[in-house]
Amino acid sequence: MTSRILAARSPHRVFTLGFALVGLATLAQASCLMLVNTSIGLLVVREFSLGPQVVGALIGIQATCALLSRFPVGSWTDRYGSRLFAFGGAALMVLSCVAFILSLSIRAAMPIGGGVPILLILASGLSGVALSTFSTAASTYIAYTVPISRRAEAVGYYGVLQGLAQGLGAGVSIVIVDGLGFGALYAIAGLATVVAALLSLGLREDSRRESATPMGVGFRLHRGVIAPSLAQYSVIVGTGAAFSFIPLLGISRGVTNPGLYFTAVAISSIVARLLTGRIADRRGRFAAIVPGMIVTAVGMYIVSSASTAEAFILAGVAVGIGFATAQPALQALAIDLAGPAERGAAMATFWAFTDFGVITGSFVSGQIAAVSGLGTVFVVSAVMPLVGVAGLLGWRQLSRPAALLLRTPDLTV
C-alpha cells in the first residue's frame, strides 16, 4: 500500500510508515555526514599535516558539489520518485566513506594545491553530491506525502531528527577519533549510511503526473519559490558566519567555551520545532516566518556584543527558537507555491539557496572580519534576516499569490 493511498485514507495523519522510514533514514544519513564533516579538520591537520586553508578548500568542494547537483536531482525526483535518489544519495555517501578510509594509506597527492591527497578531494566531492541527492529526495518525499493541513508541522518534526543527528555526530566524532582512529570513524559512518540506504528502499509512492520542469542536468531554478528561498538565504548567511567565527569571537573575549552557543541552538531548536509548526498551519505561514526571522536577528545581534558564556547561551536560545520557527514555515511555503508535479524542483531550489548561503556567509564574513572585526560580522548577520522579512512581506503585498489559494483554498499564507 503506497504512502499516498495511506494519506488519502488518513488525510490528517503525519506519522505514517513512510514518514517514519524517511525520518529514520535521515537520522542515519545526517549522523554519518556530521561524523565526516566534524572530523575533516582533524584529519587534514593531524593526519596529513596540512594547513587550515586545505580544510576550507575541502569544505568548499563539498558545498559546491552539493549546490550544483541539487537542480537535476530535483527535476528527476519529480519524474521518477524519491526512493531511487534517496538510496542513491546514501550509496554515494558509502563510497565517500570508503574513499576517506583509503586516503589514510593511499596518499597520492595533487601536483598543485599544496599536496592535497587526491582521494580526499574525491571523498569531499562525493559527500557533497550525496548530501544534496539524499536531502533533496527526502524533502521531496515529505513534500508529496504529508497532509497539506499539517505541512509545516511535519517539516518541523522532520527537522527535529536532523537536529538530533547533528548533535549526535558532532558530539561523538572527536571521541571516536581519539579512541579508535580515523579509519574506525569512517567505517562507523559508512555503516550508518548503509542503514539509511536500506531504509530508503522501503519508501513507496504512487506514479506522479508529468512534470512541467524541463528534463536535463542544467542549472534550473524554480522561479515560483524564489521569494521563500531568498528569505531562507538571508537567515542562513548568518548561520554560516556563526559556525566559522563564533568560536574565535568567544575566545577573543575571554569566554572559555563559546561552543555552548551551539548547544543552546540545538536544544532550543528541537523544542521549538516540536511546538511551532502548528502555528504556521493554523494561523498562516507568515505568522511563523515573520516573528521567527525577527527573533533570529535579535539572537545574532546579541552575539555581536556577547562577552560572557551566559550571553552566548541566550543568543543561542534566540537563534534556535527563531530559526526553528521560521524555517519549517518557509519550506512549507515553498512547497505550497510549487505546482503539484514540481515539488522536487522546488525543494532543490530552496535547499540550493541554503547551500549558497553557507558558502557566501563564510566567505563574506571572513572579509568583513578582516576589515571591521568579528563583532561587525554578527551585526551584519542580524540585519540580513530583517532585510529578508521586509522583502518577503513586500513580495506578499505585491503578488498576493492567488494561484496558491486556488490550489489550496483551506490554506492561509
Name the predicted role of every residue range:
Residues 125-161:
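Cytoplasmic helix-loop-helix junction between adjacent transmembrane helices
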Residues 63-67, 71, 166-167, 266-270, ...:
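Residue-level signature of mid-helix packing/kink "hotspots" within the transmembrane helices
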Residues 191-209, 391-396:
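C-terminal membrane-cytosol helix-exit motif in multi-pass small-molecule transporters
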